[in-house]
Amino acid sequence: MSAITITDAAHDYLADLLSKQNTPGIGIRVFITQPGTQYAETCIAYCKPGEEKPDDTAVGLKSFTAYLDAVSVPFLEDALVDYATDRMGGQLTIKAPNAKVPMVNEDSPINERINYYLQTEINPGLASHGGQVSLVDVVDDGIAVLQFGGGCQGCGQADVTLKDGIERTLLERIPELKGVRDVTDHTQKENAYY
C-alpha cells in the first residue's frame, strides 16, 4: 500500500474481526475526520459491500479489501496500522503522523487557507486565554464569517482581537480576502477571559 501500511499482525486481527461479521465481502474503510486540523482523528470502520464511496481507493489485501477515503489519502501518507498483544489481549493502534498536518497552498480553496491560518497561527495564541475562533462561511463579497468560542465568547477584547489580530493576519496571508465578520453571541459571558 502506498499511503498506509497495515502490518501482518493488524491484518490478521482485522481479518478475524471481519470473519465474525457473517457478511461476505466485508472490508474496512480508513478515513480521517477533520484532516489537516488539530482535531484530526484516524478511523477504521467496517465497510459492507456497497458502502464504499465511488472515489475511495480500494486496496486488496490477503483476506479483505481496505477502502481509503479519497480526501484522507494525502493525510494517511506514512500511516501505520499495527496490532500488539499484551496481558489484556491486545490493542490495534493507528499512527498517522500526517493526519494533523495542513496541506494547503496558494491554489487551495479560500476556506481551506483561512482554516489553515486559524489553526496554525491564530488559535494557538487564543488558546492561552482558553479561546478559539472558527470559520463559519466565506460570503460572496470575500468576507470571512467567523465565530469565537471558549474564553473569547463574550470577551470585552474580542473586537480588538478580531480587527487588530485576526483580520490583519488573514488579509496579509490571503490577498483576495476583503475582511472578516464576527457572528458570535457575545452576550454569553460566563466563560469570557475579560
UniProtKB/Swiss-Prot annotation:
GO MF assignments: 4 iron, 4 sulfur cluster binding; iron ion binding
Pfam families: Fe-S_biosyn (PF01521), NifU (PF01106)
Keyword flag Iron: yes
GO biological process: iron-sulfur cluster assembly; protein maturation
Cofactor(s) for this UniProt protein: [4Fe-4S] cluster
Sequence positions that bind [4Fe-4S] cluster: C152, C155
Highest taxon above the source species: Bacteria
Keywords on record: 4Fe-4S, Iron, Iron-sulfur, Metal-binding
NCBIfam families documented for this protein: YhgI_GntY (TIGR03341)
Family the UniProt entry places it in: Belongs to the NfuA family.
PANTHER family listed in its UniProt record: FE_S BIOGENESIS PROTEIN NFUA, IRON-SULFUR CLUSTER SCAFFOLD PROTEIN NFU-RELATED
Task performed by this protein: Involved in iron-sulfur cluster biogenesis. Binds a 4Fe-4S cluster, can transfer this cluster to apoproteins, and thereby intervenes in the maturation of Fe/S proteins. Could also act as a scaffold/chaperone for damaged Fe/S proteins.
Subunit structure: Homodimer.
Record HAMAP family: Fe_S_biogen_NfuA
Protein name, entry field: Fe/S biogenesis protein NfuA
